[in-house]
C-alpha cells in the first residue's frame, strides 16, 4: 500500500511515477475523496467545539436557576451527539472507500527501473555460461522425462490439465533439487528454514498484495462443515506465508535482517494463460518452489536485493546451467515490486531463456499493509522493507537439468553438486 501522506503531499509526482508502469492514477477521484474527508473532519471539529462550549454553559445555567435554558442547552448537546455520530459514520465511509482503492494501486517503481511497456523492453544485465552445442538431435524435457517417470497423462487423469505425476528416478531428482536448494540457502547463505501452512486467509494474502486485485489467480477453498462458508486460499507462493510471519510485529533493529526460506507447493489458476506452455512442466497449476524472503532495514534493501539475486545465481552455477539476469522494465513488474530482477535459464529445446527466478524489493509496500515495523536506533517505530525471490522454481529447474545435461541415448548426467543428494548416482538412464 502506498503512503497516504506521500499521496497527499505529492499527488502529481505519485501519479507520474505510477504512469511509468502503465497505471492511470485518477487524480480527480483522489482529490474529491480528500475534499470529502477534509469537509467531514472540519464539520466534526466544529461540532466538538460547539458541544464543549455548550456543555460548559449547562452547569452555569443550572447554578443560576435557569432550568429551561439549561434543558435547551442539553437538548442541543444531544443533537450534536447525534450529528457527531453521523459525521463519524461519514468519515468511516470515506476512509473505507479510500483504503479499498489504495489496496488496488501498485507500488511505485524505483528510479533505477528502466522504462518500458512490457517484457519486450526488459534490460539484460548479464549472461553467465555458454549454451551447450549438441552433436545430436536434442529432445525436450517431456520426451526425456517420460521414460524416466514423468507422467502427464496420470496427472490429467487425477486432476485435469496442468497437473503431473512423477515417479521413480524423476521423483527422486525433483526431491534432490529442492533439498539441494534448501541446504545451499540455509548452510551457505544464512537463511532460516521454515515450514508454513499451504492454506491462508484473505488478510494474509492482502498483506503481500495478492488480494484484492488478483483473486482470479488463486485457488479458493472452504472448510467442510463450516456453515459460514469462509473462503480460504491455497498459497500461490511461500512468499505469502514467510513475509506475513512479521505482520503486526515490531522487530528490534539488531535482529535485522531476517532471512527466511521454505520449500512448498505453489497453486495458481493461470487464469490468463490459456493456450500458453500447454506441453510439459513450464506452466502448472501445482508446482514446487524454494522461496527466499528477507526483512531488512530500509537503508539496506537494495544491497539485499543484489545479494538475493546472487543467492539464486549460486544455485544455477552449481547445477552448471547457462542463464541470464534481466531487469524488468516498469511495465512488466509485479504489483508489489519497486524493482525486480528475473533470472532466466537456457532451455535448449526452445532455443531460448525462460524465467526460473524472480527477485523483488517491495520496499515498505507490503510492510505498510501488514503493519510490519522495526524499532530504529532512536527508538522510533518504522516500516521494514521486504524482499522475496525464487531460489528456485523446482519444476523449471528439473526441466533445465534434463535438457541441458541430456545425452544422445536419452540418459541425463547428474551435476556433481547434486550427486550427494542422489545417493551418488551420476546418471539417470532409461531402464
UniProtKB/Swiss-Prot annotation:
Q: Where does L-serine bind?
A: 237-239, 291, 390
Q: Does the keyword Cytoplasm apply?
A: yes
Q: Which UniProt keywords apply?
A: Aminoacyl-tRNA synthetase, ATP-binding, Cytoplasm, Ligase, Nucleotide-binding, Protein biosynthesis
Does the record bear Transport in its keywords? no
The UniProt entry lists the main location of this chain as: cytoplasm
Spell out the GO cellular component terms annotated for this protein, sorted alphabetically and separated by semicolons.
cytoplasm
Q: Which PROSITE patterns match?
A: AA_TRNA_LIGASE_II (PS50862)
* Location within or outside the cell: Cytoplasm
Q: Which InterPro entries match?
A: aa-tRNA-synt_IIb (IPR002314), aa-tRNA-synth_II (IPR006195), aa-tRNA-synth_II/BPL/LPL (IPR045864), Ser-tRNA-ligase_type_1 (IPR002317), Ser-tRNA-synth_1_N (IPR015866), SerRS_1_N_sf (IPR042103), SerRS_core (IPR033729), tRNA-bd_arm (IPR010978)
Question: What catalytic reaction does the record list?
Answer: tRNA(Ser) + L-serine + ATP = L-seryl-tRNA(Ser) + AMP + diphosphate + H(+); tRNA(Sec) + L-serine + ATP = L-seryl-tRNA(Sec) + AMP + diphosphate + H(+)
Q: What is its EC number?
A: 6.1.1.11
The protein's enzyme class: ligase
Pathway it works in: Aminoacyl-tRNA biosynthesis; selenocysteinyl-tRNA(Sec) biosynthesis; L-seryl-tRNA(Sec) from L-serine and tRNA(Sec): step 1/1
Task: Point out the coiled-coil segments of this chain.
Answer: none
Q: Gene3D superfamilies attached here?
A: Bira Bifunctional Protein, Domain 2, Serine-tRNA synthetase, tRNA binding domain
Which HAMAP family does the entry link to? Ser_tRNA_synth_type1 (MF_00176)
Q: How does it assemble?
A: Homodimer. The tRNA molecule binds across the dimer.
Domain statement? Consists of two distinct domains, a catalytic core and a N-terminal extension that is involved in tRNA binding.
Q: Which family does it belong to?
A: Belongs to the class-II aminoacyl-tRNA synthetase family. Type-1 seryl-tRNA synthetase subfamily.
UniProt protein name: Serine--tRNA ligase
Q: Tell me the organism.
A: Neisseria gonorrhoeae (strain NCCP11945)
- The gene for this chain is serS
